[in-house]
Design a protein with these regions (language model features):
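N-terminal basic, low-structured, amphipathic or hydrophobic segments
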Residues: 19-22
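Extreme N-terminal basic, low-complexity initiation segments
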Residues: 2-10
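A cross-taxon signal for low-complexity, glycine/charged-rich
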Residues: 3, 14, 26-34
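Basic, polyanion-binding surface patches
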Residues: 33-241
């Protein structure tokens, strides 16, 4: 690890206005941006990061939470949060989560070909956290976390009744990740097509889903770090022509 300085010369802030930027709430101001000299911490991941905590998770953040419900072939239901989760395609709508080991969720989805994703919100934060407990395969995290399973309409997997948004999904593919050198990582990316969507109508205003109304929570850096998304944090930025 080593530190080095990046110097950008002839910085002209008056030429760095951001076109199309409009804030939706009072108190948020548009400012000019200027890149200046930085004292950089540099490292190569293969040699270690040299910090108290690996910054990778904190840099690639915030990340939506993959709160995944699944059912085993014998009917046992599972609920677990995953911090590596996102959407990957519009048509068809595809979401995916990565598991850092072959866990019950992945096994269940491979066996049945189905799963549900449930939106984790501020109101459900403690319940979501409780469902992360390492328990025996036959223990239901729904019951452990005090949540209500509701049968899916398309898939045979329950969703979280208390969550304002849920997706029913069918398995697209499970991929074992690998490094640039071709070595297999102990991580599996599970991708699924969204075949049904459940939205609390209170989250919809004038025909538009309002992300902030649900107060979603998203993963930050260390094991216990999260952010809450609020309506007042939103701003709109129109793409240039």
């Amino acid at each position: 690890m080593r530190k080095h300085r990046t110097v950008v010369r002839n910085c002209a802030p008056e030429n760095l206005e951001i076109p199309g930027l409009r804030f939706a709430h009072p108190g948020m101001t548009e400012g000019k941006r200027c890149v200046t000299a930085k004292d950089l911490h540099f490292y190569e991941p293969k040699n270690g990061h040299g910090l108290k905590h690996d910054p990778f998770n904190a840099i690639v953040a915030p990340r939506p939470i993959g709160w995944i419900s699944s059912r085993g072939p014998k009917g046992n239901i599972n609920l677990a949060p995953y911090s590596f989760f996102n959407a990957f395609c519009y048509v068809p709508p595809i979401i995916g989560f990565s598991s850092t080991s072959w866990k019950d969720s992945v096994q269940n989805i491979q066996d049945t070909g189905e799963f549900c994703w449930n939106l984790a919100t501020m109101d459900l934060a403690r319940h979501m956290n409780a469902s992360a407990a390492h328990v025996a395969r036959d223990v239901s995290e729904f019951e452990l976390a005090g949540l209500t399973p509701v049968p899916g309409k398309i898939v045979g997997v329950p969703r979280v009744a208390e969550s304002p948004v849920s997706f029913e999904c069918k398995l697209s593919q499970i991929l074992q990740l690998q490094g640039a050198d071709g070595r297999k990582a102990q991580a599996w990316l599970t991708l699924g097509e969204v075949v049904a969507v459940h939205i609390d109508k209170a989250m919809i205003k004038d025909g538009v889903y309002q992300t902030g109304l649900a107060h979603p929570i998203v993963r930050a850096g260390r094991k216990g770090d999260y952010f809450e998304i609020k309506p007042e944090n939103m701003f709109e930025m129109v793409r240039p022509d």
